[in-house]
């Protein structure tokens, strides 16, 4: 077994909950669910369809602004961005477009057009998406490939730290959440790809491609 985040082999059992095994990578400190317990693609998609993310809902926009506000300060006016894993209600795309940015969007279930792979972007957002990655190493490499040098990747996910009771953690209980990251994980990801890394607030990380 190798870590799906960094491909390291220094893995140990972290916890066993409801007959599901969770492992921790001692290299990058990611925690991940045994792939034997992953949902089928159909079951996963059905869960996502249940999400009610109205792109004009002010509460949802307020939630997304936790990433929007810090990354928009890094950007030149009108540059092109990509929302990676935008889900069925791409509100963040709408927020950037309203501010004058040119946006593409990608989601493997709802917006599966992969033409973005032939382009490059000044910024990429990945909001409440990385915890769903079955193959995060490959996903982050794909993102890195289409991110311009000097460009920004903004990511939002719940960070794990050892003060959290993992068994009772609501974020773990979502059956579509299969990978959990700590601050240490993100610093490791950055060092492996020659990105700089800053954490402007809780559960938000900004990477710059050097």
Residues of each region from the PLM?
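Conserved beta-strand signature within the Rossmann-like core of class I S-adenosyl-L-methionine
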Residues: 150-158
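Alpha-helical subdomain
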Residues: 164-168, 172-184
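A short, conserved alpha-helix within the catalytic core of class I
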Residues: 133-143, 157
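A short His-aromatic
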Residues: 128-132
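Residue-level detector of anion-binding/catalytic polar loops
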Residues: 102, 152, 196
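Short conserved AdoMet
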Residues: 76, 134, 148
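Conserved N-terminal segment of class I S-adenosyl-L-methionine
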Residues: 1-123, 127, 140, 156, ...
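C-terminal lobe and adjacent flexible extensions of AdoMet/dcAdoMet transferase-like proteins
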Residues: 209-210
């Amino acid at each position: 077994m190798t870590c799906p985040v960094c491909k390291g082999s220094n893995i140990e059992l972290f916890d066993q909950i409801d007959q599901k095994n969770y492992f921790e990578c001692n290299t990058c400190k990611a925690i991940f669910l045994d792939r034997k317990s992953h949902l089928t693609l159909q079951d996963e998609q059905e869960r996502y369809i249940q999400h009610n993310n109205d792109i004009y809902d002010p509460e949802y926009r307020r939630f997304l602004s936790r990433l929007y506000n810090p990354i928009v300060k890094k950007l030149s006016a009108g540059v092109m961005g990509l929302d990676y894993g935008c889900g069925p209600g791409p509100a963040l795309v709408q927020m950037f477009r309203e501010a004058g940015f040119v946006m593409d969007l990608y989601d493997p279930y709802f917006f599966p057009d992969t033409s973005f792979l032939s382009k490059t972007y000044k910024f990429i957002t990945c909001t409440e998406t990385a915890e769903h990655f079955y193959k995060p190493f490959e996903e982050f490499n794909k993102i890195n490939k289409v991110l311009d040098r000097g460009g920004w990747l903004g990511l939002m996910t719940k960070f794990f730290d050892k003060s959290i009771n993992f068994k009772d953690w609501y974020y773990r209980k979502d059956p579509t959440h299969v990978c959990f990251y700590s601050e240490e994980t993100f610093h490791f990801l950055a060092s492996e790809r020659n990105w700089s890394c800053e954490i402007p607030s809780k559960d938000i990380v900004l990477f710059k491609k050097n």
